[in-house]
Amino acid sequence: MTKTLTKHLQAIKDSKRGIFVPYIMAGDHAKGLDGLFETITLLENSGVSAIEVGIPWSDPVADGTIIELAGQRSLAKDVTLTAIIKKLQEKKTQVPLVIMTYINPVYQYGIEAFVKDLAETSVKGLIIPDLPNEHADFITPYLRDSDIALVPLVSLTTGIDRQKQLIDGAEGFIYAVAINGVTGKTGNYRDDLDKHLSNLTAYADIPVLTGFGVSTEEDIKRFNAVSDGVIVGSKIVRDLHDGKEEEVAEFVTFGSHFEK
């Protein structure tokens, strides 16, 4: 059974539009979790393809300063994975949600319960950056009969054989990491990045999205030329925190309506 996230993003790709997925940190709002659906609605109204929802954690190894600080602000409001899932169960969203979490909160929650409770939300994808592919069976047996896709991350340093291993049988989309390091770094792209992304996109039979360091309209244009779309995190998180909702809406609208 093809999962909803795969079909949804593939339909956008087939329509010759760029896929645009913004990242937000759950609980990083003046109203805490009570503001979560306000942010989701703002992004939905701007035409996003899906929304990545970050789970705050005390040791976010893949996060740069902006997202790490957002997580700290959320944790200071006593936001937990349990509270986030309960909030997401309150109503369905217009677009699929993708949870980005580290493995520890999932382990503490209970893997089977985690997947079961997520099934009662609009979450259709799951990203766990500190879960190596070799240990994916930690959670895949529970996801197999669900409509939640485990999204693989492919970095610049991933060898060809391992790339194929990660891509073959993957669901949802391929998360192509544009920089070596944490989120939020901008501009320090390798010379062979475009070729790397083009090769990934040509090989994969599901959409390939470029993330980490994507922050400008020029980035959106560049990466839509060599992949199927982009994920934007740090810029969105920073601008929302700074109260720049109109600027966020304009940027997201540009990315979400980008014609190939």
UniProtKB/Swiss-Prot annotation:
InterPro entries recorded: Aldolase_TIM, RibuloseP-bd_barrel, Trp_synthase_alpha_AS, Trp_synthase_suA
Membrane-traversing stretches: none
GO molecular function: tryptophan synthase activity
Catalytic activity: (1S,2R)-1-C-(indol-3-yl)glycerol 3-phosphate + L-serine = D-glyceraldehyde 3-phosphate + L-tryptophan + H2O
Record-listed E.C. numbers: 4.2.1.20
Active site residues according to the UniProt entry: 52 (proton acceptor), 63 (proton acceptor)
GO cellular component terms given for this protein: cytosol
Pathway(s) annotated for this protein in UniProt: Amino-acid biosynthesis; L-tryptophan biosynthesis; L-tryptophan from chorismate: step 5/5
This protein's UniProt keywords: Amino-acid biosynthesis, Aromatic amino acid biosynthesis, Lyase, Tryptophan biosynthesis
Assembly mode: Tetramer of two alpha and two beta chains.
Similarity annotation: Belongs to the TrpA family.
Role, per record: The alpha subunit is responsible for the aldol cleavage of indoleglycerol phosphate to indole and glyceraldehyde 3-phosphate.
Protein's recorded name: Tryptophan synthase alpha chain
